[in-house]
Amino acid sequence: MTYANIILPLPLEGYFTYGVPDALASRVTAGVRVSVPLGKSKTYVGIVADYPVNIPNPSENDVAGGKKITYKNIIDVLDNSPVLLPQQLKLWHWISDYYMSPIGDVYKAALPSGLKEEYGYRPRTELYIRLADNLRHERTLSLMIDSMKRAAKQVEVLMAYLQLAGVDEMAEITPKTVLREVTREELMNVTHASVGVIRALQDRKILITYEKEVGRLNSGKPSHPENIKPLNEAQTEAYNQILLQMMSHRVTLLHGVTSSGKTEIYIHLIQKALNEHKQVLYLLPEIALTVQITERLKAVFGDRLGIYHSKYSDAERVEIWRKQLSDSPYDVILGARSAIFLPFHRLGLVIIDEEHEQSFKQQDPAPRYHARSAAIVLAQMYPNAKTLLGTATPSMESYYNAKQGKYGLVELTRRYKDIQLPEIEIVDIKDLYRRKMMTGPFSPRLLSAVREALGRGEQAILFQNRRGFAPMVECRQCGWVPKCPDCDVSLTYHKNMNYLSCHYCGYTMKVPEACPCCESEDIRGRGYGTEKIEDEIRYIFPEARIARMDLDTTRTRNAYERLINDFSTGKSNLLIGTQMISKGLDFDKVSVVVILNADSMLNYPDFRAYEQSFMMMSQVSGRAGRKGRQGLVILQTKSPELPVIQQVVRNDYQSFYSDLLTERLEFHYPPFYRLVYVYLKHRDENTVNSAGLELGSRLREIFSDRVLGPDKPAVARVKTLNIRKIMLKLENGIDYSRVRQYLRGALEAVLKDKRYGALQVYYDVDPL
């Protein structure tokens, strides 16, 4: 008997060891799926991590707690070849180790659901029609047709089939004639015949039906490298500099201003990689971005391009996965965060566009990995594979690494076709509110700028980083605010459906007709979400063709495409949206962009608030002004004097970076220190408090003043669980493997206390 270590999709540390029956041993290898028993009645699909593994004298010596260990056997091997390549298994282990997450959680995040179940994936099949073999002679077929004179419809269908199959004359039919494959649906569409007519031809043994597997993936058109646009002088210089930097660096940062034409540089780099017979992974932070970029890449790379993200059906994702394992994989994969888990045989280039984006960081559930970091590690597993980070607003960590020489650095400071950067106009709404000159959240300057743009046949974008109709509703008599019963947050009002919802757990309730505290009916929304902005702007501009892009309006793949296509083609001319509209979308007719409230981002209680606000405002501003016209950005704020606001206006990333770097060094934050958050959750607040204090005390014994907390996070209760957070600030260069060891040891010591049996603990490494 041999033994194998198996990864199961369970949030438990380590592997499960199973016996491998001799009859299955030849089919077991690392990366194949196996069916295994667990407990008394459950069966799971696991992944073989190691085979064979040494078990010393399993029949005699394995004893735990006085009980002999018995090993269950694998039930079956589900694959003829591995569904995971060696590089993928290495990436799984790195993510599990670095982000302190059980490898079973990595399994759950990485594999499409259809591969996690023994019978989860069903290939799509279609019914085809063919002529019976004995009728593939002119005389035999003619006699058969003559005998069917009373079945005119059947004769019509048979003749239509022959025509579709490529037979122009009966004399052409021989047993060696190659007939075109015809689907039953195609034949029915051409002849308008019923299934009954075709079934009658089957009963006569004239036509034979057979089932054939057909893919769900669009085959696409052949690639057209000639569609690659030539680079201008600035782009060519940047392209050459990137190649030069890649000779001495595995990772290069392209810092290019908005609308500088970074995508065209990417396309040239992709083509170079393909010419060298290498594969390319192109990562984007938002699914919305893939809609626009897909069309550009398809025009060049055609059927060599595959797209992979969560809006595709599970069956489609399984088929892409299997295609990547085949001998004819996609050469270019365009995808969001989860695309890092796909198999690649010959990966040569990874492009991470908008590398600064928070969307690259997985939050819940585990593993809480950063796709940028994981993609860099993935590329390093392939010989000479390079990573290119691209953005107009680099993250502090990436720019610091580039400045320190760890990454290559290329700057692209000119916009494509020398389009001017937009004029950014600050509007002090604090003064306007005091003088009662605001119309809701809209300043007079905002309204006049939008009115003028629409009057010229141009488009405008309004940015408000909060979805829903209003952040909360409130009783104007007693101040009652409806809160989620399970979370420590107020409910958000959604007017279109007339309900209140919790954006943390999904709890919903109808808006009460009267206040439950004082019975007043004067219940109104407070604040402005995108839905309310849309409502009020329709009243002010009734002639405008308004679209809204937020999580509520883009829950399906087609919703993204429809909204973006409608705005691109002019069906809508005023787009209201949350942060997803800031992420690299290009619209030629947008001349005005409005940031409705910069302060809501700046005042968030997080050390990254200014960094994220600068990036968000700069990226949103970059949507204004494209071909032949300088754009205008209206930036509404109550704090126009803040340095970060002035830096956005001047498009002064260097000054922003320098100021923030000094602050980060002083207060021990990234890029000089690494952060690890330890979260504790429990239904009982006293229990989570005491557990947090005990764990914090044990960690302070090891890490001293590097430990902060436990504290309550901004939202201290979610889904009935009370939350506490402990922060570790660790110097760069510290032995991180020992840190993990100490963390786990301290936690194990705390969990020995029976009071903490139901305590949930997880880590967030490099949190955002």
Please report, for each region that a protein language model flagged, where it lies by residue.
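Inter-lobe coupling/hinge segments of SF2-like helicase ATPases
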Residues: 226-232, 236, 248-689, 697, ...
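Solvent-exposed residues in well-ordered beta-strands and their adjoining turns
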Residues: 9, 21, 681-683, 729-731
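Short amphipathic alpha-helical segments
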Residues: 14-16, 183, 674-676, 722-724
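A general secondary-structure junction signal
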Residues: 50-52, 111, 211-213, 464-466, ...
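C-terminal structured "cap/appendage" subdomains that terminate the fold
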Residues: 695-735, 739-744
